[in-house]
Regions:
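Active-site core of bacterial EAL-family cyclic-dinucleotide phosphodiesterase domains
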Residues: 42-111, 148, 180, 208, ...
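Alpha-helix termination/capping residues and helix-transition junctions
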Residues: 23, 58, 139, 169-174, ...
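EAL-family c-di-GMP phosphodiesterase catalytic domain
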Residues: 2, 38, 98-100, 150-157, ...
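Catalytic core of bacterial c-di-GMP phosphodiesterases, primarily the EAL and HD-GYP domains
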Residues: 1-2, 29, 39, 85-90, ...
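Alpha-helical scaffolding flanking metal-ion-dependent phosphate/phosphodiester catalytic sites
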Residues: 13-14, 147, 221
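C-di-GMP signaling machinery
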Residues: 3-8, 16-65, 75-78, 112-116, ...
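Structural preference for long, well-ordered alpha-helical segments in enzyme cores
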Residues: 10-17, 49, 91, 107, ...
């Protein structure tokens, strides 16, 4: 074995296997897996690169924006794309890595959460997106911006102070800001309620993202004073299937009706074709989001694609 290279690599692999064995419980044998080891090494590499990016004034981090449209404007249109009314955007994190290219939030947020970097990056996201919203509100005062919050931001930073600072630095109208949280994973619900009450006192709306993937009931969500339920795209994908979609559509319709009765709106995510709209229109959702109306894009591309909606009618 070559001391300078192969031995060190062998020890790394042995340490990895030992760590994986401990994770699986006491007295368990873990057989080395090269694929899992490669993922582990890549993760460590990305963690260090992300840490460097944060130190270098968030170099490589970008925000992309996906249109959110008014579903009520589409039900009577023969051409669903031409009849679309973009009313806002969801801000989505991206990070440009020389070795791996442009990475999405699902690839980097878990690493940011585990490493503790989510607190500074989260503050950067709030300021960046609030400022972008302020710029677009110069042309359309009603245009809103949705920003995702990680549950770790509630635990590793003073999230209320972070939001207040972003509001002050950007000068955005808080009524045009929507903070998105998921159903589960947060600190105790009493503390969460207090924090959300402070957001509402600032006139900031709160949406529940990926609704249906957790175990919350609508009454609990109502107690959080949520503005909109965003149904997970998996619901929509099942609902538009030729076979088996009818039962899923009934579930979606039930959720929409209940949400409306409780004073909440519903956004359907993952709408990808005009046929999807035709199938979903009778369910009476309030908003749609999906590739039919636009993929996540840079702010410049978003302006080019949606200029007529950024400018007030």
């Amino acid at each position: 074995v070559n001391e300078s290279g192969e031995l060190k690599e062998l020890l790394k692999k042995a340490d990895f296997s030992l760590s994986m064995g401990k994770r699986s419980g006491k007295n368990n044998l873990y057989l080395f897996n090269s694929i899992e080891y490669t993922k582990h090494i890549n993760k460590l590499y990305l963690r260090e690169k992300l840490r460097d990016s944060v130190k270098e004034n968030f170099k490589g981090f970008e925000m992309y924006y996906q249109p959110v449209v008014d579903a009520s404007k589409l039900s009577s249109c023969s051409n669903k794309v031409d009849g679309v009314k973009v009313i806002g955007a969801e801000a989505l994190l991206r990070w440009s890595c020389p070795e791996f290219g442009l990475l999405g939030a699902d690839q980097i947020v878990p690493i940011l959460e585990e490493s503790g970097l989510i607190a500074p990056v989260g503050r950067w996201i709030l300021i960046k997106t609030f400022t972008q919203c302020k710029m677009w509100n110069e042309y359309n005062k009603r245009f809103h911006m949705s920003v995702n919050l990680s549950y770790m931001q509630f635990e590793r930073s003073d999230i209320v102070l972070d939001v207040q600072m972003a509001l002050e630095k950007s000068g955005v109208n808080p009524e045009n800001v929507i903070l998105e949280i998921t159903e589960s994973g947060y600190i105790d619900h009493v503390e969460l309620q207090k924090i959300l009450d402070e957001f509402h006192a600032m006139k900031i709306r709160v949406d529940i993202d990926d609704f249906g993937t957790g175990y919350s009931n609508l009454r609990y969500i109502q107690n959080l004073h949520a503005n909109t339920l965003k149904l997970d795209y998996s619901f929509v994908h099942k609902a538009v299937l030729d076979k088996g979609g009818e039962s899923e559509r009934k579930v979606i319709e039930y959720i929409i009706n209940m949400a409306h009765d409780l004073g909440m709106n519903v956004c359907l995510e993952g709408v990808e074709s005009e046929s999807d709209v035709e199938i979903l229109a009778p369910l009476k959702a309030d908003k749609y989001q999906g590739y039919l109306f636009g993929k996540p894009m840079s702010p410049y591309a978003f302006i080019d694609e949606n200029r007529k909606f950024i400018v007030d009618e």
